[in-house]
């Protein structure tokens, strides 16, 4: 019996979809708690201070820096040694990601250009890689591997775009002295890389210093995670010429972070930030411009932007559809890109100081992501392959 339970737990942890499922559960739990008799304790705990920061700030500024470290490692690995390692491979997901960020932002601005909430334009521009891949993996072999690769590549480029947006548009009150010290930390990390240092310990220690001064500078501290990731060596250790690329420092660090990030950090973030108390909000909150802009941006803007870009590139002969994929399958995959949970929530906290606007954005994220996720799942579940056969056949 104990062995069977252990095997069940192990299979869950090894499943592609389990991280997304756990994130869904943590978000649902946050919503339930925030609207129960425990709501006061929930919000009180988030705003309680541990040292210099509140619990919510520790989650959003410190734990999420580790999440962004893993995102940065994924970006570098794919650019150097993966699905984005050549320009032809980057064209389709790159163009789709760019359009998939621009169109949702425009949809949001159509609702909020003149009402003081325009600063939230980037909220629906992000795709949640954990959720999207979690949903598509639930369909198993019904979805061709090429589409999973396309979705992963698009989401990674989307994450890179989100990181750039956060750095450029959601940074205020910069301290030049601390920023200079953070830059010195980056220079030291680059020097380690160029010197051929392969041990991870010096990089991680300097990464902590970089995080501290980045946080102090006013630039969002999570950017430190990405900068650290880009300096981690991906080449094999010279002393082990027989070693595979998968034994590089970057791959080893990424592998060690996957489960802690997927099963601890991201669910904690979801639980700490998805809680919206509907008490006193009223139905008008569901139809507020911010709510409508975010929901429409995710559910409609992502679809129009990404599918439109793919359609244009394929019909003009620049690229072809992913191998074995049909247009209905591409449509379903595009819909899944409208799941914008983690990164969208994160940007909403940076965009708005007003709790009411934050709550409206969260409602929009939940509605848009739910509609996009369900629609994408249904379309993919009943789509036919490029050869016309049902996946169930």
From Swiss-Prot:
Signal peptide segment: none
Catalytic activity as recorded in UniProt: Na(+)(in) + 2 H(+)(out) = Na(+)(out) + 2 H(+)(in)
Keywords assigned: Antiport, Cell inner membrane, Cell membrane, Ion transport, Membrane, Sodium, Sodium transport, Transmembrane, Transmembrane helix, Transport
Keyword Cell membrane (UniProt): yes
The keyword Cell inner membrane is annotated on this UniProt entry: yes
Subcellular locations according to the entry: Cell inner membrane
InterPro entries, per database record: Na/H_antiporter_dom_sf, NhaA
Annotated transmembrane regions: 18-38, 53-73, 91-111, 120-140, 149-169, 172-192, 208-228, 263-283, 294-314, 332-352, 363-383
A Gene Ontology biological process term: regulation of pH
Gene Ontology cellular component terms for the protein in this record: plasma membrane
Protein function: Na(+)/H(+) antiporter that extrudes sodium in exchange for external protons.
Family of this protein: Belongs to the NhaA Na(+)/H(+) (TC 2.A.33) antiporter family.
Name of the protein this chain belongs to: Na(+)/H(+) antiporter NhaA 2
Phylogenetic lineage: Bacteria, Pseudomonadati, Pseudomonadota, Alphaproteobacteria, Hyphomicrobiales
């Amino acid at each position: 019996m104990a062995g069977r339970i252990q095997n069940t737990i192990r299979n869950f942890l090894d499943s592609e979809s389990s991280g997304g499922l756990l994130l869904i559960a943590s978000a649902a739990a946050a919503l339930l708690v925030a609207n129960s008799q425990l709501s006061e304790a929930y919000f009180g705990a988030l705003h309680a201070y541990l040292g210099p920061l509140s619990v919510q700030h520790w989650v959003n500024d410190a734990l999420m820096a580790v999440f962004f470290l893993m995102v940065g490692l994924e970006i570098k690995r794919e650019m150097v040694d993966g699905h984005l390692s050549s320009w032809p491979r980057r064209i389709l997901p790159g163009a789709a990601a760019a359009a998939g960020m621009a169109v949702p932002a425009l949809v949001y601005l159509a609702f909020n250009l003149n009402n003081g909430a325009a600063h939230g334009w980037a909220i629906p521009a992000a795709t949640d890689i954990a959720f999207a891949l979690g949903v598509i993996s639930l369909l198993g072999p019904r979805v061709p591997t090429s589409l999973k690769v396309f979705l992963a590549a698009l989401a990674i480029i989307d994450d890179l775009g989100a990181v750039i947006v956060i750095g450029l548009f959601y940074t205020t009150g910069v301290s030049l002295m601390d920023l200079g010290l953070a830059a010195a930390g980056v220079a030291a990390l680059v020097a380690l890389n160029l010197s051929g240092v392969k041990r991870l310990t010096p990089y991680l220690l300097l990464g902590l210093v970089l995080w501290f001064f980045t946080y102090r500078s006013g630039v969002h501290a999570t950017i430190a995670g990405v900068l650290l990731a880009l300096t981690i060596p991906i080449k094999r250790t010279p002393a082990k010429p027989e070693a595979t690329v998968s034994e590089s420092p970057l791959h080893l660090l990424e592998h060690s972070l996957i489960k802690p990030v997927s099963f601890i950090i991201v669910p904690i973030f979801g639980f700490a930030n998805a809680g919206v108390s509907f008490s006193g909000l009223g139905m008008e909150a569901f139809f507020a411009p911010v709510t409508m802009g975010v929901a429409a941006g995710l559910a409609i803007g992502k679809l129009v932007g990404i599918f439109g870009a793919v359609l244009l590139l394929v019909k003009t002969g620049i690229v072809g559809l992913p191998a074995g994929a049909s247009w209905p399958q591409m449509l379903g995959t595009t819909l899944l890109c409208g799941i914008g949970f983690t990164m969208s929530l994160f940007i909403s906290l940076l965009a708005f100081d007003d709790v009411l606007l934050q709550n409206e954005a969260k409602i929009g994220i939940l509605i848009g992501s739910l509609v996009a996720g369900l629609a994408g799942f249904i379309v993919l579940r009943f789509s036919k392959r490029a050869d016309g056969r049902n996946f169930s056949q």
